[in-house]
Amino acid sequence: MAHTGQKLGRYTLHESINEGGMSEIWLATDEAGRPFAVRVMKNNTAFAFAERKRFNSGAEILQACQDGQFIIGYVEHGKLGDDQVLVLEYVEGSNLKLLMAAGDPVLTDDIARVLIDFTTAMEVVHDRGFMHLDIKPENVLLSRNGSLRLVDFDLAQPIPNPPRKLDRLSGTPHYMAPEQLLKQPVDHRVDIWAWGVSAYELLTFKKPFPGENADEVLRRQANRREFVRPRDVNADIPAELERIILKCLEQDMNRRYPITSVLVHELKQALYV
């Protein structure tokens, strides 16, 4: 296990700042004292084939999606000593899920810019030929100066053409599209659905399809009689923005936005940005 003061190549670990099932993220500095976020894989035994493949695949896709603005900065990945690591830019800030929980004013004062930057980050991923497959507020960092970064590419895959079934069901059910939960063929439009769920949540502080498990979420998606439109929760939401969100949340993926650039364009028009 990684520990405070441990040296991994040119990096010294200082403080654990986040932890997930597969890895732990540390604040680290290099020999020049510059800060980085170092993600250390927990289970790096000789038999952790699947975990290592997923870790490295996510790192490679992240590297391919670098844009210098909306995607978390990639530095390097590989084995340092006995540990499998991914070194990233360090962003001093918080994710959108935590900002929602804290009732941070940025989600009211600057929500238009947050939504547009969030969508633009997703557009970058799709333009590079990948689907993220884990779009949600928790995977979007907002720095103290307001810059946004999309993170966590562990589940990302190349966009299939035509759509195909995923090998396994991974992700967070509340943000999964119906075709995902039903284990039907998918493509990048599952990300567009997840963005719609996230936008609804950021604007209303409620989930559009609440449920204790995947089956309940799926039932709510299919039975729209219980669905509450965003403007019925927050009357300040512009009608055109509501229309965009509802288009992202179409049950039939063919009725959602076909490409993310159209979503970005319409969103900018709706928000006058």
Regions found by a protein language model. Give the residues of each.
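Structural helix C-cap motif within protein kinase domains
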Residues: 204-208
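Conserved short submotifs of the Hanks-type protein kinase catalytic core
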Residues: 81-95, 99
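Activation segment signature within eukaryotic-like protein kinase domains
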Residues: 114-115
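Activation-segment/catalytic-loop signature of the eukaryotic protein kinase fold
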Residues: 77
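Protein kinase catalytic-loop region centered on the HRD/HxD motif
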Residues: 120-130
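AlphaC helix of the eukaryotic protein kinase fold
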Residues: 45-64
